[in-house]
């Protein structure tokens, strides 16, 4: 076991040393070589020795020579400088212009005789001279130009206006006719006749009364808390004489068709005490003659009595408190026909 550990330790040390050596070798290889170590250095040295007796190499390129120029004096430097300052033009004569032209021709001829052996001449800067016009001469020329233009433009303008502007003849003033005021007819307001309210239909003295009774079962009473909702669902309305009435309109308006009262004296109801109210029965009655169709009114009263008996678990009786039957119904209808005939 100890020998195995020693072998592993030696192998690890060898691996570490190999990694370090390889790293240094890689870094050394990647570094750029200096000019002294470059293989092209000897090539350039050998090329310097292969030149002919005139100093040219195989490509015909000679050695670089540095020549010092002759010193330039201050006077020559001042003459070479270009004067950019504006100068006032002067008026030159024809003789001066001719001399300048001859001087230019001489310079051109001298340029043709130039050779390589001639020494370079100093450059002479020639100043350009422009004619100067005095203020008086300029003003006179301007005045003459204005006078000439004004004389030529004046007739043209006058003829232009004469040809373009037409002669306007005075137009006659339009005569305005003032219409005479027309008197509008005065409308007299005619008072509309007030609608005449229809006189209420006056019924004659009652000739007959049709009566129906709705009574509770034997030994029981009708409860006011159940009676009031049933009456309202049948379109009865509490009104005159503290009893309920059925009108022409289901909303409780119009003429009274028939009425409903308490069967127990005094025959009235108290709405504030309807929940505690109890009675043995109620009575429905219709007078003849009546408003509207009596047959229709009786049919509505009979249907309402049947509905109350069903809602309150009561019994329907005739005017003599006898159970309602078909013969009693035919008797009531005959009484209605008798009143209409």
Curated annotation (Swiss-Prot):
It is a single-pass type I membrane protein. Residues 90-100 have a biased composition (Polar residues). Keywords: Cell cycle, Cell division, Cell inner membrane, Cell membrane, Membrane, Transmembrane, Transmembrane helix. SUPFAM superfamilies: Cell-division protein ZipA, C-terminal domain (SSF64383). Residues 175-190 have a biased composition (Low complexity). Residues 35-134, 157-201 are annotated as: Disordered. It holds the Pfam family ZipA_C. It is found in: Cell inner membrane. Residues 1-6 are periplasmic. Interacts with FtsZ via their C-terminal domains. Essential cell division protein that stabilizes the FtsZ protofilaments by cross-linking them and that serves as a cytoplasmic membrane anchor for the Z ring. Also required for the recruitment to the septal ring of downstream cell division proteins. Belongs to the ZipA family. This is Cell division protein ZipA. It comes from Shewanella sediminis (strain HAW-EB3).
